[in-house]
Amino acid sequence: RQRQMCIRDRNGTVHIPAAKNSVLPLLAAALLCNGTVRFLQVPHLADVDTSVELLQGAGCTARWQGSDITVQGVPSTCRLAPEAAARMRASILFCAPLLARLGRVETVLPGGCRIGARPIDLHLSGLAQMGVHCREEGERLILTAPAGLHGADITLGFPSVGATETLLLAAAAAQGETVLRGAAREPEISDLAAFLNRCGGCVQGAGTSTIRVQGRRMLYSCSFAPMADRIVASTLACACAAAGGRVELTGCRPETYAPLLEILAQMGCRVETGPESAVITRLGALHGAGRVFTGVYPALATDAAPLLAAAMLAADSASSIEDVVFERRFGCAEGFAAFGAAVQVQGRTLDIRPVRQLQGACARAADLRGGAALVVAALAARGRSRITDTGYIDRGYAGFAQMLAELGAQIEREMPRESASEKKTPSKKQN
């Protein structure tokens, strides 16, 4: 069945939850640890549930305890649950810990949103330098480390976040020192390194382009609170810019999404920041941003591109935004057009011309961030809107409708009506 959000039309305060993009590699890292690992205040997301399923399938005890997740036990099987692995791109992160523990892993090629090419060649070439043999059999990927993992000096051709995380996980349990050059610098990398160090690892340089890791034979248990989600913060900041009002975002360091805040300020929003808070206010007209580009951290995040584009729809002059990371980032453009927006996709660039007023409409989410961007656009539209296929949004936002409602948005989650054929016939009582 389709899941839907119904939006009828933002002031308030929201405490930003833990970052999905940090929680997923952290759950994979728990495979390296002896004892019980507890992750604190984890948002209940579809992708997090998939990660828990992967851990359980590997033979670990992984379960929710309130808003925390505990992981215990050494993995006992090298085969990742194929249906779960195929649902989520981050399933590739579970390979390195299983290789370290068992010397072999079998999986299917990872899934994820269809936003463009997302190859895993950097993951595999780096692992090969650490002693891993790789072969593909159809959709299956089989990795082996017959002599175990060993340290290496690895230079990434592109600062891929996923490849950096994979190699960091492998290096933490490898024999000897590993040097990662050209590494991604995203704060989620630093969060993963902080967790590994908390568990007894030795990681230096995370957050820079060169990371040094001394492998450890054993990592220990700990409790860890993942960092706040800078993309959720970016989403709510863009919602305020699009619809107007005042929003205070707490618990998330503004420097982690500073490029987006700077662009919103250039567009006419008032932005005030503290050590772990930001207040975004838009009372007057919103202006176009000119030409904007995404990039690798610390540039504007690719995940924020559709959200910023949704805010640009409400501006009084033209904007364009180019995503240099993924070639099909703006699958939401068709949905924007349904609201009456004047948009055109040219290659990796979305061009936006001003219109007098967006109008409420029905639009379909085609991916995670694009789906959230449609909700942001709907907040700026006049009248009632409906967003369908919101299961995509559930992969990265916990209680999204409730979060926006607390800011004053008129939004509700609709459950689809059962058709006559779907209604269950009451069973007869048996004597």
Could you say what each language-model-derived stretch is?
Residues 1-4, 8-431:
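Short, structured segments at the rim of ligand-binding sites
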